[in-house]
Amino acid sequence: MSLSVEAKAKIVAEFGRDAKDTGSSEVQIALLTAQINHLQAHFAEHKKDHHGRRGLLRMVSRRRKLLDYLKRTDLAKYSETIARLGLRR
């Protein structure tokens, strides 16, 4: 299940440079983190959903790649983003 339009708009407003900034790395990382957190609750109940778990692993990998890119290009934004999201990197 994906995030609602309102939830996405809230995340974009919080992490984006303006209301329509959906492409910046910070926004993409925040959206992926919200989806990952939502899916973790799903997998606590549905342990045998292997097809869904593959999608979750793809999201985690994509978020990791975006975090690596952000760390390589702008260390200050990287540190701020992981602190705001509560990621342990």
Curated annotation (Swiss-Prot):
SMART domains hit by this protein: Ribosomal_S15 (SM01387)
Entry keyword set: Ribonucleoprotein, Ribosomal protein, RNA-binding, rRNA-binding
Domain of life: Bacteria
UniProt cross-references to Pfam families, sorted A to Z: Ribosomal_S15
PROSITE patterns in alphabetical order: RIBOSOMAL_S15
An example Gene Ontology biological process: translation
Similarity comment: Belongs to the universal ribosomal protein uS15 family.
HAMAP family named in the record: Ribosomal_uS15_B (MF_01343_B)
Subunit description: Part of the 30S ribosomal subunit. Forms a bridge to the 50S subunit in the 70S ribosome, contacting the 23S rRNA.
Protein name as catalogued: Small ribosomal subunit protein uS15
Organism encoding this protein: Actinobacillus pleuropneumoniae serotype 5b (strain L20)
